[in-house]
Amino acid sequence: METFSLKDCSSVASSPISSPNISTLLKIKVLSWSKETGLPASVHVRVCNKSFNLHKSLLCAKSGYFKEREDQLSEIEIPQEFPGGAETFEKIMLFIYGCPTLIHPFNIAGLRCAAQFLEMTEQHSTGNLCERFDLYLNQVVLQNWDDTLVVLKKCQDLVPWSEDLLIVSRCIESLAFTACMEILDPERRREKPVIMLEGMVNQPWEYTNIERIINQDTWIKDLTDLPFEFFKKIIGSLRRQGMKERYVSPLVALYASKSVIPEGQTNTDILQRALDLLLTRDKAYRFVPVGFYFACLAHNLKHDTVLKLQDQIVSLLHTAQPENFIYPKAGNRQVAFSQELLTMESLFSVYVSTESERHLTSSSSNVRVGKLWDIFLSRLPYDQEMKTTRFIELIETVPMSFRESHDQLYLAVNAFLQVHTNISQEEKGSICSYLNCQKLSQEASLELVKNEKMPLRLVVQALFIQQLNTHQAFKDCSDSFRFTNSADFSGSVVPSSRPLTSQQSPCTDDETGPRNRPLCFLMQKDATLDEFESTSFRIHNLEEQLVSLKKSLHSHDNLKKPNCLGKRSASRNKNTFGQVTTACIGSVSFTSQRKYANRLLQILRRVNLFGSRKTNRSKAGESER
């Protein structure tokens, strides 16, 4: 047998960076003790198919377990459930023989459980192993986040010993307290806001987005990497210590998401249990985006859980994104009655029923839901097996009062007609009867007019609506330049020399968006602003001339001479405007009156000419396009 000196044993065992062969060190210590005392190793201990020859006197002095078996035979069998196995037993024996034992977060949990199994407490020896390990746990391990995580993960293989000795609970409470401090720390909040999921409301619930959020905070990443049983205890401790639900619920959602996405790696059992943590809390759904619930709904869960998920989705449906929806797989010949479509139809139907009971049919949330449903219909992978009646049922799932705009509904109808090319005109008319051309934007109307799949009657309606919009736009534009303070001529006021700005013009876009713009402006929007400014200036000049003529006529009526009643001949005087004034209205000649009328007609012709030129330009623009 190869020999080693005690000096080598001590130096190797105490070195923090070396990895000594524990079995060899133990053999050295046993041989050294036998030489020093002259006593042989009289006890044969067997642990997990590994045997050790040890001294009974040392074992009984340190361990209550061996002391109770002192009168037994010289061979002792340690049960298979001994925590830590043979390797941990060797480290415990090194301590008994006086060799310094390397203690670190990776082995402290196993050593503490093994010491408890062997009853190495203060009752049998002062400064025994149980007390030393507890001191190391409390003053070293639990003061550090990373060390606590290491010990907690090691405790997973030491259950129930680690739980009975409160190692798990101490680690849980320490981690939860540190997490609360991370959120409450004002300095940290200034430098880096606490991670929540508000930013995910307008984003699809995808793996890349979830992974990015998890990796932004170390403490969130560490907690979501824990085994579920420990994570569950962490959540309970966070709630007991007062962490707000707005932080706890997103943490549960992130943990559950790791078992849902990416696809093909779903752990349904963990997902089910994680959802139980979330769905049992009142109002916890407020802090989790609806996309998470849609992602969970696509998996095989218990019926009760599915019902709870649907309730959460219905309450948050107006905040959903089309990317969050579950769609039938492309190529599925049973799209009309696929599970995905039936589920989505049920969700929207429940929402409509709930809102109908509350008599809220025109709220912004309902308008949002109506648009989402039409978007969903426009993205369905339609097949020829879907009947027209089934498609009409889908349209009627959401009432028409929920639809302020029919743009998305038009896209859905168009998608259906593109696949069903052989349906009758009667069926096509039934489907298109749900479209209201007055609720289509200019872009959608223009596309509808060009779409050969649309019925001719609908195309004519769209053209008629656009003509009305164009006529109204010209009327509004004309009315905006009238004078409003003159009762005799046109009821308008002399405008200022400054032309109207684009913000003041009724012909430019406003907050209502492009939906209310007439078709002519859509087709000429590149030249609209320049044309408006030029038109404004020309009309301004024309109206100044009209006002000048009106003043001249008034002056002519009011200027009379006192002796005009008895005279047929009148002296004529011209004013600065070149207009004739007379002593009496009856003395004005027919020639002068026709002169004034001709001037008025010329001005009116110029106004009419302006309107015809604008119409010609509009027609020219349409022909070019």
Swiss-Prot record:
Pathways per UniProt: Protein modification; protein ubiquitination
Residue ranges annotated for the NPH3 domain, each copy included: 217-469
Keyword Cytoplasm: no
Pfam families membership: BTB, NPH3
Annotated CDD domains: BTB_POZ_NPY3-like
The BTB domain, residue ranges: 41-105
Keyword annotations: Ubl conjugation pathway
Record's compositionally biased regions (Polar residues): 494-507
Annotated region (Disordered), positions in chain: 494-513
GO BP annotations, alphabetical order: protein ubiquitination
Record's function text: May act as a substrate-specific adapter of an E3 ubiquitin-protein ligase complex (CUL3-RBX1-BTB) which mediates the ubiquitination and subsequent proteasomal degradation of target proteins.
Record comment regarding domains: The BTB/POZ domain mediates the interaction with some component of ubiquitin ligase complexes.
Entry similarity comment: Belongs to the NPH3 family.
Alphabetical list of PANTHER family matching this protein: OS12G0117600 PROTEIN
Protein name: BTB/POZ domain-containing protein At5g48130
